[in-house]
Amino acid sequence: MEQLPSNLQVLLQAAEYVERREREAEHGYASILPCDPATPGRRKRQRTNSNPDNVRSVHNELEKHRRAQLRRCLEQLKQQVPLSMENSRHTTLSLLHRAKQHIKKLEDQELRAKSLKEKLRVEQQKLRQRLKQLLPPNTERIRTDSLDSSTLSSERSDSDQEDLEVDVEGIILSGNEGELFVSFSAGLEHSYSTPAHAWL
């Protein structure tokens, strides 16, 4: 994300330069360096030693290569930026301005997502502390890396295992404790029922 704005500025400058050169070519003039009257003999020798046709052909090839590279970059940018359907033809400047607005929009969304993630992390930590306070001290808890995989190691008898309830987070509860945790879980679901777009 940090390199995109700098690349965009380069493309904007290149597009303005190309349009300025095209306008100059249409009017039949170009920017020429002023002649230095102090050294006429040196400039005359440079003109005689260099072939104007070769210089012009090299310049044309370099300009052609640069325009082709710029065109490829603009085509790639057009695929990444959502364009308006009102106008089928988009100029280079309008495309670059839309790309700049799109980058700003993505940066704002990233900031809001980070803020939401931090709020959820703090809320999750508070809920874990509350859950730890509600659970009795002799309750066995399983540490799991994910909700899909959990292991249970206990030396309880088979009759004791039948009276226990295991929730999705690997917390072993007895009958009365299970009812308490069900009501608490309902409160957790209610706290997370806020739509995601409210934060975004």
UniProtKB/Swiss-Prot annotation:
Disordered as annotated region, ranges: 26-56, 134-164
Cell compartments where the protein resides: Nucleus
UniProtKB keywords: DNA-binding, Nucleus, Repressor, Transcription, Transcription regulation
Domain of life: Eukaryota
Residue ranges annotated for the bHLH domain, each copy included: 54-106
SMART domains xrefs: HLH
Pfam family, one: HLH
GO molecular function annotations of the record: DNA binding; protein dimerization activity
Quaternary structure, from the entry: Efficient DNA binding requires dimerization with another bHLH protein. Binds DNA as a heterodimer with MAX.
Name assigned to this protein: Max dimerization protein 3
Lineage: Eukaryota, Metazoa, Chordata, Craniata, Vertebrata
